[in-house]
Amino acid sequence: MTNADANKPNERIFLSLATVTEVEEQAVVRALHSGWVAPLGPEVDAFEAEIAKRCGVDHALALSSGTAGLHLALLALGIGEGDYIPVSTMTFAATTNAIAYVGATPVFVDAAEDGNIDPELLLRTVDELLAEGKNVPGVMIVDLFGRCADYPAFAPRLEELGIALIEDAAEALGASVDGQPAGSFGRAAAL
């Protein structure tokens, strides 16, 4: 880098760009004109129904953030202090923050070459924690960059062990594995 380069403003490189079209603008205006900006209303009800349908699940709840969804999932499953939750190293802070919010301990598991959690390392980590007498009531799996984790490689074993699978599928809405959509592999998911 030269001195001349140091004086240039940094160009921002976005991971992804938001796409807002007339469809989204009309939906916002429709919600504002309906008088149902808060608490919720028909637009949110329709959104929840569409998400549930697309994910092939019975229920979907719109919350303020993916972090809130992960936090709520952990609380609903009774996960808290003294629990150990394996989670991918390749993630956004919200994933591990939600685990910390409930007093549980995140146990980091390295990623495979695709960026998602390494199935073999995940199962080995679970086995090691259980062998040490640790309580592992759940795992939190992160789907990255529009790709689902390799759920068929580990979900059946987790189910055998009675370990809840929680999906952080915020980056994978619309993705699937063998026709099964993101958000439908575990006991709960945040999209």
Set out the residue ranges of the language-model regions:
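N-terminal "arm"/small-domain region of PLP-dependent enzymes with the aminotransferase-like
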Residues: M1-V37
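Solvent-exposed, non-membrane alpha-helical residues enriched in polar/charged side chains
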Residues: V29, H33, E48-A52, H71, ...
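Phosphate-binding glycine-rich loop
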Residues: V37-Y84, A98-Y101, F108, A131, ...
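Short beta-strand->loop structural element characteristic of the AMP-binding/adenylate-forming
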Residues: V87, T105-N116
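Conserved coil-to-alpha-helix start sites within the AMP-binding
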Residues: T91-T96
